Amino acid sequence: MGIRQMSNLQQRIIAALIGVPILLFCILYSDYTFLGLFLIVGALAQLEFYKLVGSMGDNLPLTFYGTFCGIVLHLLTFFIEKGDVGYQNYYILSPLLTLIFFIKLYKSKDEKPFKNIAYTFLGIIYVALPFALLTVLAFIQDDKYDPNIVMGCLFLLWASDSGAYFAGTKFGKTKLFERVSPKKSWEGSIGGLVTAMVVATILGNYFTNYTTFQWYAIGIIIVVAGTYGDLVESLFKRSINIKDSADTIPGHGGFLDRFDGLLLSIPFIITFLKLVR
């Protein structure tokens, strides 16, 4: 029996057994393996986004250009946060992002250039920017690379997703946002919150650079913002009548599906930690 013929739960378990060790190794080994991992994941997620947008009628987002801008943003953020280059290098983005207007002048087949410019920028803001901000999170403590905060956030995200999945499957009756995502339930969300708080308690005892209260707060942010991140992507996918952004990761869909909860969480987590530390 092939992996695609297995149940959703079986596929999720296999994906976790393969994917989690790779993620943890890249995060723990060095800041450069961390960069390489999320640079690739971010670029693939952005490509998935543009592919979805391109499937909507006559939309023609600049896929290569948008993904290239996302990669440049990610690299700049990494080396600036690492302290290798100064913040003034962010000015590189200004002419780079402006180039899209010149490029569109030569796209004679594009009947709605400004609509597609907007979709191109949306891919940068919605997908590339949060992955770049993940680097800010990794260097948030004294400008030194801290794998613990990244791993902690991922553990909380996985705990929340798993708790929501099992609680929703077993007890889910009260719809959370039926118009957008019929399968999501309040019971599932509560289950996700409970498992996230359990993991936050454990993190508070082992990753002591942050207090247990801070881990609780980060957990709540991930549960709330992550749920809305899922709903936002569900709304987007429903508007183009698809179920998953791709089928790259068995049991989860694509990279955009797997990390959508993290995309909206990261800006709030960074803001919280900047204010309380």
For every predicted segment, state its role.
Residues 263, 268-271:
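Hydrophobic alpha-helical transmembrane segments of membrane transport and translocation systems
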Residues 2-220:
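Membrane-embedded alpha-helical bundles of polytopic integral membrane proteins
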Residues 239-261:
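Interfacial loop-to-transmembrane junctions
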Residues 271-277:
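Juxtamembrane boundary at the C-terminal end of a transmembrane helix
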